[in-house]
């Protein structure tokens, strides 16, 4: 989901 997508990017940051 979108929330998971944002969480993925934040995890990489």
From Swiss-Prot:
Q: Which domain of life is it from?
A: Eukaryota
Can you quote a single GO CC term? extracellular region
Q: What is its main location?
A: secreted
Q: Where, by tissue, is this protein expressed?
A: Expressed by the skin glands.
Q: What's a BP term from Gene Ontology annotated to this protein? A: negative regulation of nitric-oxide synthase activity
Give the protein name, as stated in the record.
Signiferin-3.1
Known function? Inhibits the formation of NO by neuronal nitric oxide synthase with an IC(50) of 55.2 uM.
Residue list for modification Alanine amide: 13
Keywords for the protein's UniProt record, in alphabetical order: Amidation, Amphibian defense peptide, Secreted
Subcellular location, record wording: Secreted
């Amino acid at each position: 989901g979108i929330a998971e997508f944002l969480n993925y990017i934040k995890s990489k940051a």
